[in-house]
């Protein structure tokens, strides 16, 4: 190996070697960072990191020149300054150039301790300053917790590499970020006068799921009601949300009035009880008006967060549990009637999200 103390580059470094070096360092310094390694594996990891730094010290000038050529105006570098030492470059790499761009500060939190995680998974995040080592994308474990987007080196990290509040942002697919086979897996989160966050998912479907989840929360932040509620889908659930309208036609039929008017006084109470039973039966029938469960995808929901029922008629469920909605007759109170694993009870609609995008 060339002498690490050498300050000049012995020759141009092939692009294939640059890419290989970038991938190896990402894996060794970042991916393995959150893994539970044996003592021998940790020593080997540290040795590889040192060797990579030695190689970079030899080709430092070339990396710097390459970075200047690739640096564009699309991103601002908050860590601008002299990069004449490996320690400074390493520090920038370790921090993932992920300082908050809008001045917001969030306390450190372990990935496993995030509350109310709506969606999480591994994504490739585009570096804000991707000149260092000449590569752009880094694998990150990302999580949408309430209205804050966190990203970590892995799902075992004790502290996030960065985060930002999504309020005020917009999200969209963008197939112009890459030219390889993953171009249809890219999306970006952007806002005027704010930093652009760009990601690559494992598949186009996964990218679309991230976009839909983010849009759901952003739409909720911009309104006083939960998106996809009754105003948007009222025609589908009119017969469910207004049970009185279901039973009222039975009471208004002339033949019913004639029958009960002719009953003797002592039998009116019995007739009234029968009417109440009929009304109750009509309301109960609402639970089964949605159709065949095997194809009724619109009424399948999943838990956004853990929920423990306070009363015996309330269902308890965990985040991700599948719940089939039988009725929305208590929608005005924020409750629906759901079924999970054979149990039926009330569920708070704010704790649910649609399972299928129809």
UniProtKB/Swiss-Prot annotation:
Residues 116-219 form the PH domain. It holds the Pfam family SH3_1. Induction: By IL-6 in myeloid cells. Residues 296-357 form the SH3 domain. The keyword Cell membrane does not apply. GO terms for cellular component: cytoplasm; cytosol; nucleoplasm; plasma membrane. Dephosphorylated on Tyr-75 by PTPN22. Phosphorylated by FYN on Tyr-260. In case of infection with Y.pseudotuberculosis, dephosphorylated by bacterial phosphatase yopH. Disruption phenotype: Mice are healthy and do not display any obvious abnormality. They have normal T-cell, platelet and macrophage function, but show reduced levels of spontaneous immunoglobulins in the serum, and defects in B-cell proliferation. Belongs to the SKAP family. Interacts with LAT, GRB2, PTK2B and PRAM1. Homodimer. Interacts with FYB1, which is required for SKAP2 protein stability. Interacts with PTPNS1. Part of a complex consisting of SKAP2, FYB1 and PTPNS1. Part of a complex consisting of SKAP2, FYB1 and PIRB. May interact with actin. May interact with FYN, HCK and LYN. Interacts with FASLG. The SH3 domain interacts with FYB1 and PTK2B. This is Src kinase-associated phosphoprotein 2.
């Amino acid at each position: 190996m060339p002498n690490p103390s050498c300050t000049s580059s012995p020759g141009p470094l092939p692009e294939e070697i640059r890419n290989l070096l970038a991938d190896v360092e990402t894996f060794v310094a970042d991916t393995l960072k959150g893994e539970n390694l044996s003592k021998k594996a940790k020593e080997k990891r540290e040795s590889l990191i040192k060797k990579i730094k030695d190689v970079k010290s030899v080709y430092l000038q070339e990396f710097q020149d390459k970075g200047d050529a690739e640096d564009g105006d699309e991103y601002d570098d908050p860590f601008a300054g002299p990069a004449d030492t490996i320690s400074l470059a390493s520090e920038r790499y370790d921090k993932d150039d992920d300082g908050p761009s809008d001045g917001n500060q969030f306390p450190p939190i372990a990935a496993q301790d995030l509350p109310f995680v709506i969606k999480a998974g591994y994504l490739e995040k585009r570096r804000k300053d991707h000149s260092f080592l000449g590569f752009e994308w880094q694998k990150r474990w990302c999580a949408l917790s309430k209205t804050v987007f966190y990203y970590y080196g892995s799902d075992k990290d004790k502290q996030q590499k960065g985060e930002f509040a999504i309020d005020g942002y917009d999200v969209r697919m963008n197939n112009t970020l890459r030219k390889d086979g993953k171009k249809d897996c890219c999306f970006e989160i952007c806002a005027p006068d704010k930093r652009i966050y760009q990601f690559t998912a494992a598949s186009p479907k996964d990218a679309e799921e991230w976009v839909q989840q983010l849009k759901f929360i952003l739409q909720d932040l911009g309104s006083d009601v939960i998106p996809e509620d009754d105003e948007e889908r009222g025609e589908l659930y009119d017969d469910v949300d207004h049970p009185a309208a279901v039973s009222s036609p039975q009471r208004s039929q002339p033949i019913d009035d004639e029958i009960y008017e002719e009953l003797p006084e002592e039998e009116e109470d019995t007739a009234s009880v029968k009417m109440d039973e009929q009304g109750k039966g009509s309301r109960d029938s609402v639970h089964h008006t949605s159709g065949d469960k095997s194809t009724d995808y619109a009424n399948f929901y999943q838990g956004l967060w853990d929920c423990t029922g306070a009363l015996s008629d309330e269902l308890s469920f965990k985040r991700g549990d599948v719940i089939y909605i039988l009725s929305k007759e208590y929608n005005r109170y924020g409750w629906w009637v759901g079924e999970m694993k054979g149990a039926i009870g009330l569920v708070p609609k704010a704790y649910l999200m649609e399972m299928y995008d129809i």
